[in-house]
Amino acid sequence: MDIEETIYKYALTNAIEHGNKCQVGSVIGMVMSKNPEMRKDPKTVSQLAGKLVAKVNNLTPEEQQKEVESLGGLEQHTKKEEKPKGLPELKNTEDKKVTLRFAPNPSGPLHIGHARAAILNKLYQEKYNGKLILRIEDTDPKRVEPDAYDAIPQDIKWLGIEPDEIYTQSDRLEIYYEYAQKAIEIGAAYMCKCDGGEFKKLKDNCQPCPCRSHTIEENMELWNNFENMEEGEAVLRIKTDINHKNPAIRDWVAMRIVNQEHPRLGNKYKIYPMMNFSVTVDDHLMGMTHVLRGKDHLANSEKQTYLYKHFGWDVPEFIHYGRLKMDDVELSTSKAREGIENKTYTGWDDPRLGTIRAIARRGIKKEVLYDLIEEIGTKQADATISWKKIYGLNRNIIEENTNRYFFIPNAVKVDVENLPSSKTNMTVERELHYNKPEKGFRNLTFNGSVYIPEDDYKHAQDKNIPLRLMDLINIKIEEDKVIYDSETLEDAQAQHARIIQWAPVETSISATVVMPDNTHVTGYIECDASNLEVDDMVQLERFGFARVDKINDNEITFYYTHN
């Protein structure tokens, strides 16, 4: 096999393994690593790789497959050794039912950051045959989005998570009141009426406020009168170490008054627990053995440990992981809501957002998130998820079973002139999936009038080179006329023609593809797409993968997934 044939085979291999598109750099790397003798002439290798990559990328998937088979099949090459999968072991799992919880605040639908917590808990539940609890933490009326009560269970269901038990904290206020009173009775908590600014000065100087020395009886009297006070007039504090090195840990607030109507409770209550109090009480009563949370909760874990010890309760194992970011995507719920309110975003499933429903609408599979989250694990180092990684994993999942169709973006209608009589009424049969003939075929009729992509039309016009309509004929553009040029693929390749998709004018269906930046690409799709159903995944040849979002009588709307 000569040098050109060798590089050609590697280019075909790279294309077939990566969505039918190869990259010059990848091909050169494969060639050099497997054929050390070629390192002596890198210039020639580089020039040939550039030419052959362009040739391969101009072939249809079927043509790539046929070409590589004619050369003896895919080139074998060394792949990077895969890292072993699996989460680290949890401590202290012996002789107990491992119990975990996913506890989101209902400030909006879930995003990828929430998915990390949900999936980690799910994976550990499965690993230890444990129990998983969903707990909606809605004890701050100012941070509750009513729609989230329905959205969170829906998002959890899409992730494939079925909690063993579900709780909503606003149903449990009387329980928190009971334990607040118990904390007072054992001397672990006190009612504080100090001005917030004054208390901070004392706290920062490791000095107790005057309220800390109240007797239990004095604290109970204030507690019993708490409901008659105004917001900010008093709080219930948990005693910690007033000399603690972190001022945030010192005598933290457990209960406060919130003068805001609660979406579920109305104005029935005005005394609400702070997160650290309600979470500790619930985690104990619900039998939590392990708590997985972000490292931004390190101080909260320490605060909660004081309350565990006050009550003589077992402290669960706390596992803290790093922050999760996503390239070019808004994960802040508050910023997303602001964008929705000012019409920057179309809703919680706007493709520019990192919400679960936005990702799902684009056709990203939940298995991708599981793979990513398991790989990142519980490391305390911050992690960034790239779209490139998501797309690669998703492509591996969907490619095998995704049918192919011709979509013509920004379509130009052309009438091919000078057709031989044998080409005036033809039917082209194409496989729905070139690797799975058992899936069947689609038929495209040709009578001279077709839609082709505007970009390809302009390219042929500017470069004065023909275009090949896939599996059909070659055409050329002379001024504003489209003329029959020749018939064979070899003729097209000899003239460096682009091989393009097309659709019959008479039978095509209007189609719109919503892109990741929320722009809309309009065009036409072949008539066999009328058999599609909502949520079907397709590969629009030479355009990308997409999910069927909506089907009307004469139009299909897709959401673009990736290339």
Curated annotation (Swiss-Prot):
The keyword Ligase applies. It is found in: Cytoplasm. It holds the Pfam family tRNA-synt_1c_C. A motif ('HIGH' region) lies at residues 104-114. GO terms for biological process: amide biosynthetic process; glutamyl-tRNA aminoacylation. It catalyses: tRNA(Glu) + L-glutamate + ATP = L-glutamyl-tRNA(Glu) + AMP + diphosphate. Its EC number is 6.1.1.17. GO terms for molecular function: ATP binding; glutamate-tRNA ligase activity. Residues 61-94 are annotated as: Disordered. Residues 76-94 have a biased composition (Basic and acidic residues). The keyword Cytoplasm applies. GO terms for cellular component: cytosol; protein-containing complex. Keywords: Aminoacyl-tRNA synthetase, ATP-binding, Cytoplasm, Ligase, Nucleotide-binding, Protein biosynthesis. Belongs to the class-I aminoacyl-tRNA synthetase family. Glutamate--tRNA ligase type 2 subfamily. Catalyzes the attachment of glutamate to tRNA(Glu) in a two-step reaction: glutamate is first activated by ATP to form Glu-AMP and then transferred to the acceptor end of tRNA(Glu). This is Glutamate--tRNA ligase. The gene is gltX.
